[in-house]
């Protein structure tokens, strides 16, 4: 029984599904997808649970959410192993994901008060108040790269605001989704407040097509995000928050410490086997001897990165990709770039057949025309050389995406120029592209999102503002507008 609907664990009536470790092939999870009828059942359960959950005080909802944080802490080791085994991540990285889930609770509570709390301004004849109300029933679509942390960034703020939820994890990480839901069950959520439906495309389409849905919160690919945007077009009454990918540029302009810059680049491009939406996809490197030396060192160090299984010792920097198919797609993308005229500096290699262990790849594309503006979701870095900083900014902005951008340079003036001209929601200076502050919004523009950033701003799309003018009594104004006559004279 792998679906959780209205407080009960039930068996899916859709297609059967098996999840294997992407490196070893070990069977980790087996179950069935939710069919359309069960998706509808989950929506009805969420709708029925909404009035009572929304009427609870924030303090009462917060008790349940904080209880969940405690359960995450007590079950950190077990959840770390589940995420690592299912995604192929090394143990150390899965542990950082669970830690981020725990920290998200306190951050979301603080953000709720700052972004969507209550305000009251006294007026001569009363007061002006601002409150925020939950939307109702929200669907949350989770990604596979952070199957615990990223859905958590939608679910926690939505529950705090008083919404009820139908959660569909990625079909590639059903085990992690189920494990997290079992902790929410232990936290004491009332039946129907949070519901779990497993499945792939058909389940997702049934969920996004529900008429009785008040909103949809999505993290995933641009292609799927665009499909959801089209599907919900003409329905302005539904909130839609899209956090999608990027074709992110990292500008290496001037380097004082080559190894430090190489470390930053590897953290930006290859952490999580390149499966972060903020990963550097395009390395923009200044022409000249220093750039040549940096590039040679980057290739040499990247060549030593050997992917390993989640529990290998010593622990590897990167593990496998989410699937053998995903790894093969990266290899295919590299082959296509090479066929276009790209110069391979480091060829990505599948270490074994029927596995997702893929070594990083680096290919120079300077002077190659018609390079696709697409996100290759894996450890493949494309390199372009430039002559002037103005040219670098033009190259950085030459994308339909707009998620992250970074600069390595000792010159503050150049960073200030980049801040003014960059088209990206995250712009870092001498920091990895994959780093983000928990007290800042997370999202991009263009094909990277629809102006609904998550993280610190997630509270914004989980509630709507209600403004009020209030007075505890009603009296006739001393001065009336022209044309109003409240005298006792009888009109003849």
From Swiss-Prot:
CDD domains: ALDH_SGSD_AstD (cd07095). Keywords: Arginine metabolism, NAD, Oxidoreductase. InterPro entries: Ald_DH/histidinol_DH (IPR016161), Ald_DH_C (IPR016163), Ald_DH_CS_CYS (IPR016160), Ald_DH_CS_GLU (IPR029510), Ald_DH_N (IPR016162), Aldehyde_DH_dom (IPR015590), SuccinylGlu_semiald_DH_AstD (IPR017649). It catalyses: N-succinyl-L-glutamate 5-semialdehyde + NAD(+) + H2O = N-succinyl-L-glutamate + NADH + 2 H(+). SUPFAM superfamilies: ALDH-like. The keyword Oxidoreductase applies. Pathway: Amino-acid degradation; L-arginine degradation via AST pathway; L-glutamate and succinate from L-arginine: step 4/5. Its EC number is 1.2.1.71. One of its GO terms (molecular function) is succinylglutamate-semialdehyde dehydrogenase activity. Gene3D superfamilies: Aldehyde Dehydrogenase, Chain A, domain 1 (3.40.605.10), Aldehyde Dehydrogenase, Chain A, domain 2 (3.40.309.10). It comes from the Bacteria. GO terms for biological process: arginine catabolic process to glutamate; arginine catabolic process to succinate. It is an enzyme of class 1 (oxidoreductase). NAD(+) binds at residues 220-225. The active site is at residues 243, 277. It holds the Pfam family Aldedh. Belongs to the aldehyde dehydrogenase family. AstD subfamily. NCBIfam families: arg_catab_astD (TIGR03240), PRK09457.1 (NF006992). Catalyzes the NAD-dependent reduction of succinylglutamate semialdehyde into succinylglutamate. This is N-succinylglutamate 5-semialdehyde dehydrogenase. It comes from Escherichia coli O139:H28 (strain E24377A / ETEC).
